[in-house]
Regions:
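Bacterial N-terminal signal peptides
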Residues: 6-14
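Extracytoplasmic small-molecule ligand-binding "clamshell" domains
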Residues: 32-128
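Sec/Tat signal peptide C-region and signal peptidase I cleavage site
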Residues: 15-19
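Flexible hinge/capping segments at coil-to-helix
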Residues: 154-173
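Ligand-binding "clamshell"
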Residues: 79, 133-147, 190-193
Length: 193
């Protein structure tokens, strides 16, 4: 609960400053590590909303887990292979700035973020996390993106359209293990086989 409280409060009081060029892989977006990142000023109103007894994972820092590494435009390593860039890192930086904290981005595996946030290892996970009923029972969410799901097939595939759940029954589909997308597909498949 504390994670989304921090994120929601900070974003509510933070003016949005987003990069204008969003093209990827040599078509407009620089991944140079020395580029000046977007920033915002400390916001006293946001800081005042924090519970008095709140303790950050690392004092003076906003520690954020990111798991979707090298998934532009969300999170991608810069040309130095150390610095993380992308919209999720930008959101984390704006929250940290508005709270007057240094940003501490921690690359992690997808499987690690839930336990890491629950245990206090991370203050937040900003990593393309879909809001689900099960996750809402453990964590608070402050959504910063619309979750749109879709399917891709080879242009030579006999599959020309997937419109409803029964259309995927029996198909072999690649999806990230443990993701919301996997749960949806397994349920659809079970309902329609």
């Amino acid at each position: 609960q504390k994670t989304s409280l921090i994120l929601a409060l900070a974003l509510a009081f933070t003016p949005a400053v987003w990069a204008e060029n969003v093209n990827i892989n040599g078509t407009g977006v620089s991944i140079e590590a020395n580029k000046t990142p977007i920033n915002t000023a400390k916001n006293s109103d946001a800081v005042a909303q924090l519970p008095k007894d709140y303790r950050f994972a690392v004092p003076g820092k906003f520690t954020v887990a990111v798991a979707g590494l090298n998934q532009p435009p969300l999170t991608v390593f810069s040309d130095d292979n150390k610095t993380l860039l992308g919209s999720e890192v930008d959101v984390a930086r704006l929250v940290a700035d508005s709270l007057g904290l240094e940003l501490n981005v921690v690359p992690t595996s997808w499987e690690d973020w839930p336990l890491g946030v629950a245990s206090g290892k991370y203050d937040a996970a900003i990593s393309n996390i879909t809001v689900t009923k099960a996750r809402k029972e453990k964590f608070d969410f402050a959504t910063y993106r619309k979750d749109s799901l879709g399917f891709y097939v080879k242009s030579t595939s006999p599959i020309k359209s997937l419109q409803k759940a029964e259309d995927i029954a029996g198909l072999r589909i690649i999806v990230g293990s443990g993701t919301n997308q996997e749960a949806i597909l397994l349920a659809w498949n079970a309902e329609n086989l």
